[in-house]
């Protein structure tokens, strides 16, 4: 009787654990608001924004995370360490074969697709400008893009610009800065190096600071009419 009770308890606990998963992270909502992609135990899943059963998108022993949608919701880009470090991959938002886009030895993490869906914009520590006044630092990445169908990587900015989003016409890029190497998970952080929101006009190459305070301002997104920014 005792072995049966132990087995029953174990099965009950396993079923309960599967029905109440924890640590579902890095969620990102589709452009039309109907689907959410998230990371759970190193794989990507997709679920209706109204709830329901989640569909597993990746099945790999590597860690897949930080997914971002393209503008029509047909594809997602994500980071995966399938070859030792985190590279950029792209795949159908319905699952299937993932295509590797980057092959650098340093970690790379996607932020968004370009306005025309042709490029994936990502952050990485690859190459500082030759006239940079400060020695390259591991916490200060640069901004790059790579064709969504594979191709040559291009550097967009030599300064840290994270959580990038573009306006529909591609002329305005919003992002948060990174002034130093503070732990991004630090709670109630206030200091001189907290992140602020910026706007970059890609036509005039002008950067405009939107917020300036000692609290953390992060992850800006445009409102539907692009007249406001949420962060």
What do these predicted regions represent?
Residues 32-34, 72-74, 116-118, 169-171, ...:
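Short coil/turn segments that connect the beta-strands within blades of beta-propeller domains
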Residues 19-21, 39-45, 53, 58-65, ...:
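A flexible loop/linker signature enriched in serine peptidases of the S9 family
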Residues 49:
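Short, conserved catalytic or interaction motifs in soluble domains
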Residues 19-33:
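Short N-terminal segments immediately surrounding and downstream of signal-peptide cleavage
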Residues 1-4:
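Positively charged n-region of N-terminal signal peptides that target proteins for export
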Residues 12-14:
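N-terminal signal peptide c-region/cleavage motif recognized by signal peptidases
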Residues 147:
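NTP/phosphate- and nucleic-acid-binding module
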């Amino acid at each position: 009787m005792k072995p049966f009770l132990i087995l029953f308890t174990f099965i009950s606990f396993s079923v309960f654990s599967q029905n109440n998963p924890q640590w579902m992270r890095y969620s990102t909502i589709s452009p039309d608001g109907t689907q959410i992609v998230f990371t759970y135990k190193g794989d990507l899943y997709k679920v209706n924004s109204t709830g329901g059963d989640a569909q597993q998108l990746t099945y790999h022993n590597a860690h897949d995370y930080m997914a971002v949608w393209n503008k029509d919701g047909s594809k997602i880009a994500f980071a995966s360490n399938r070859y030792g470090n985190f590279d950029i991959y792209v795949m159908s938002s319905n699952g299937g074969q993932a295509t590797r886009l980057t092959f650098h030895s340093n970690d790379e993490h996607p932020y968004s697709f370009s306005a025309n869906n042709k490029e994936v914009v990502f952050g990485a520590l690859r190459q500082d400008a030759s006239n940079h006044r400060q020695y390259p630092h591991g916490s200060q990445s640069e901004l790059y893009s790579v064709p969504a169908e594979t191709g040559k990587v291009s550097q967009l900015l030599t300064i840290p610009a994270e959580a990038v989003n573009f306006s529909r016409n591609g002329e305005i890029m919003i992002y948060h800065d990174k002034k130093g190497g503070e732990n991004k998970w630090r709670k109630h952080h206030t200091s001189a190096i907290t992140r602020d929101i910026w706007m970059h006009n890609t036509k005039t190459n002008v950067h405009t600071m939107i917020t300036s305070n000692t609290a953390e301002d992060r992850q800006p997104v445009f409102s539907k009419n692009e007249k406001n920014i949420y962060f």
